[in-house]
Amino acid sequence: MRDPVETYMNLVPMVVEQTNRGERAYDIFSRLLKERIIFVTGGVEDNMSMLVVAQLLFLEAENPKKEISMYINSPGGVVTSGLAIYDTMQFIRPPVATLCTGQAASMGSLLLAAGEKDMRHALPNARIMVHQPSGGFQGQATDIMLHAQEILSLKKRLNEIYVKHTGQTYQAIEDALERDKFLTADMARDFGIVDKVIDKRAEDPAAPKASS
């Protein structure tokens, strides 16, 4: 059976760039990283989180003032892995613009909301979902109680983060996250998770206009 990672990497396009030293080939994601674009794609877990954090820190070292763009298409995942990305977004100096393509569910929606104010966007057909954290544990009664307390503590902390970035009241956030709440891009804007729904990239004012 073929390694799925190897199969995936074989499908990643390569782009060739001309430099003063000749041609240089990049995989498409490395080339976009040069443009300060990061992708948060798929389930949020420790390995993915580590790569995103490393890219954020690298781009800060490259230029501590220039904007970083984060494209999100994620169903969510491990809370602590997502919080590692969240904390790094708040820690670094460059502003982080977020854009939802596809979906931003669970921790994905929190990362979408955590972008720089007025720089959080969603494409028209993006779907956003928020809910409270969930988990399961087996063991002794005392250990089960401790894990339940930890989940409740995480729930409170996540609610506070949503309050900070959406402008909603704590009670409104708690009510919204009680069950899976699915939002269209426009609903996510009204809720405060994104600032704007965009369907076209803004034109470059410096670009030459086509003549008739």
Swiss-Prot record:
Gene3D superfamilies: 2-enoyl-CoA Hydratase, Chain A, domain 1
UniProt-listed CDD domains: S14_ClpP_2
Entry keyword annotation includes Hydrolase: yes
GO terms for cellular component: cytoplasm; endopeptidase Clp complex
Listed EC numbers: 3.4.21.92
HAMAP family recorded: ClpP (MF_00444)
Name assigned to this protein: ATP-dependent Clp protease proteolytic subunit
